[in-house]
Swiss-Prot record:
Belongs to the MurCDEF family. Its EC number is 6.3.2.8. The lineage of its organism: Bacteria, Bacillati, Bacillota, Bacilli, Lactobacillales. One of its GO terms (biological process) is cell division. It comes from the Bacteria. GO terms for molecular function: ATP binding; UDP-N-acetylmuramate-L-alanine ligase activity. ATP binds at residues 115-121. Signal peptide: none annotated. Cell wall formation. This is UDP-N-acetylmuramate--L-alanine ligase. The keyword Transferase does not apply. Pfam families: Mur_ligase, Mur_ligase_C, Mur_ligase_M. One of its GO terms (cellular component) is cytoplasm. It comes from Streptococcus thermophilus (strain ATCC BAA-250 / LMG 18311). Pathway: Cell wall biogenesis; peptidoglycan biosynthesis.
Amino acid sequence: MQGETMSKTYHFIGIKGSGMSALALMLHQMGHKVQGSDVEKYYFTQRGLEQAGIPILPFDEKNITEDVELIAGNAFREDNNVEIAYAIKNGYKFKRYHEFLGHFMNQFTSFGVAGAHGKTSTTGLLSHSMKNITDTSYLIGDGTGRGSANAQYFVFEADEYERHFMPYHPAYSIITNIDFDHPDYFTSIDDVFSAFDDYAKQVQKGLFVYGEDSNLRKITSNAPIYYYGFEENDDFMATDIIRTTTGSNFKVKHDGQIIGEFHVPAYGRHNILNATAVIANLYVAGFDMALVAEHLKTFSGVKRRFTEKIISDTVIIDDFAHHPTEIIATLDAARQKYPSKEIVAIFQPHTFTRTIALLDDFAEALNEADAVYLAQIYGSAREVDHGDVKVEDLAAKINKPAKVVTVENVSPLLDHDNAIYVFMGAGDIQLYERSFEELLASLQTHM
């Protein structure tokens, strides 16, 4: 594949999408010619593309020519995108992101990471460890991609939405958990399970699943299945756990033997599990545990997952959490790192369908914070607001006063001393965060 496609230009329709931008960066670094098109609006992935010198064009049918290979983002269709419409009308073939990836990964020993939650952090941890030990290409769902022309290994994130992971047949895969999400597509937890079960059957050499997840205990695969977790009946067990304000220390036991002592500079119980999954996979794949331990220590995290900054002596955390399970994990991490601080959560629900389906669970998760503020629901491009749910409905279910804030007025957040602020959501919650940062900075200048 290397030789036959080097002369082609890959054109990405919707290049700012997190998976798409990561793939574009990876192909660029492998020596391929890459360009893409998208909307004008700023998205956090575009900085990496711009730094790499990858052209980002407006959507235009002129971009579709004989000499480009087309890769199309999943959200773009004939009825909402001029380039797709032009390609279909004129007989130009294109592959969806996941179709292209399924074909592309066959030239490597591939490591997949699937699961309802924790995919991106775990993919980041796995690729960080591997790239420091050997030549590895990878794609992370935070928009980060790295390509190496000599890589024999490929690490990627596998997304269950609309069963997008079905073209993938990895050598190894981790599945972090199974949970009901994407209610606009999946009808029930059983429907979600069947998708993961189908994916598991395509894994070839080893499947690593969280042992305390009752659904994952029912998963079947043609490859050997290894369970990881905190219990004695797991094949790889995290033990002797010490959680501190600088991260988490633990040992991993396999077949009654300690295979290594590890430290991750990450917070929350979920990150110990993510690291244990990575350790289990690399142990079975024959990697040196001393090297794995060495590189886990230097993992700096992935974009929009517990990303911290300090503005005017105030700690602000940005996180992609948009499901109750993720909110609980993020707040747990915040408490570990800042045990003496008030935890203020600012949450923006993402999609009306998810908010309706999980309203009570969201309220319960947000109860873990000391104070709660809510932003207006961020609707997806795939849905229409029928007025069936409002953010005030969520506020009413939270067992402490939950105020609704706007981008224009985030001043109620100033009512807290000795607090850290955790902004969570998958929509445009970063606009609220930026507004709060500007407010803090302006107060500083007037002091």
